[in-house]
């Protein structure tokens, strides 16, 4: 990241802001999602999301996508697709969102997780950034064991793109042991 920090072509996200968005539900506003609905998302999603097996996320490779973002690749073995499926079954709003998601086709969900590191600013040379990233295309960052899925609000402010992420709920992934009693 140090190679990119002083480049006018790129705005880097602060490390505490790094995350994986496994389903983007909408915007917190009266015409999309109201705050009163957020609790129902948790209540409806949690029993299903607990069924997802804990997994290890393999993080490797720096790349550029959509001509606008720089990201780390993440291999979850399909676990986030399973979480998306469970959330869709439990939460009508997620069902509606995924019904219109171009990543969900008749052949299945093609979602692949990634961790956005930064975004192009529109200034300078994109080729210069890609050249700086070339040595890191096959970078192996490591493995991260995941035991919880989070429901969070990512604040988007015009004056500050990286406000603290507001975690609304953390849901333990229990896999086959999800039937083992009360979990809240």
Segments the model singles out, each with a brief description of its role:
Residues 1-184:
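Histidine-dependent nucleotide/RNA phosphoesterase domain, centered on the 2H-phosphoesterase fold
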């Amino acid at each position: 990241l140090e190679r990119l920090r002083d480049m006018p072509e790129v705005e880097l996200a602060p490390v505490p802001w790094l995350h994986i968005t496994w389903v983007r539900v909408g915007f917190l506003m009266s015409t999309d999602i109201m705050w009163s609905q957020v609790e129902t998302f948790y209540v409806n999603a949690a029993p299903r999301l607990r069924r997802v097996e804990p997994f290890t996320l393999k993080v490797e490779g720096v790349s550029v996508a959509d001509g606008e973002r720089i990201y780390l690749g993440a291999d979850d073995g399909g676990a986030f697709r399973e979480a998306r499926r469970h959330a869709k079954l439990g939460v009508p709003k997620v069902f509606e969102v995924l019904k219109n998601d171009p990543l969900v086709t008749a052949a299945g969900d093609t979602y692949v997780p990634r961790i956005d590191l930064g975004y192009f600013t529109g200034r300078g040379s994109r080729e210069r950034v890609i050249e700086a990233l070339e040595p890191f295309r096959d970078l192996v960052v490591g493995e991260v064991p995941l035991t919880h899925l989070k429901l969070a609000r990512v604040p988007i402010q015009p004056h500050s793109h990286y406000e603290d992420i507001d975690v609304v709920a953390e849901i333990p992934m229990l896999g086959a042991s999800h039937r083992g009693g009360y979990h809240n």
